[in-house]
Amino acid sequence: DVYKRQATFMVLAPEHELAASLATDETREAVEKYIYDASMKSNVDRLQDKEKTGVFTGSYAINPLSGAKTPIWLSDYVLADYGTGAIMCVPAHDDRDFEFAKKFNIPIIQVIAKDGKEIENMTEAYTEASGTMINSGDWNGMESSVL
């Protein structure tokens, strides 16, 4: 997937089997509270919540495509029973990830752009299906539709 090269964070569902084990000594209390609070909501409530909530676990993953150290968060907009319950997030190109990144001040790196021009001060995710690759190393200048 062309987007994953510039994933700036990862999110697990609060009920994911690894969620609690990813907490560090510094984040354990907040992580445990978040897991508990999320367990009190139904999946319907979680998907309808207008405001994104989450907690940083204190742990990181390594992005296999870029080698970048990627922070791991928990958020109840990810559900354990949908897919794997874990997602790599490219907030420049997904509305929910964009809202989450804006709220928690997580970097947003655009990787697909119309006519190869990066949007300055993004106010929403760029969700067009195709465009020119930017901020993507060897893929810069390539059309996303051929990757």
What does each model-found stretch correspond to?
Residues A13, E17, K50-E51, L74, ...:
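Residue-level signal for pocket-adjacent positions within structured domains
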Residues V2-Q6:
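Conserved small/polar residues in nucleotide/adenosyl-binding loops
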Residues A7, L12-A13, P64, I72-S75, ...:
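Generic beta-strand/beta-sheet core signal
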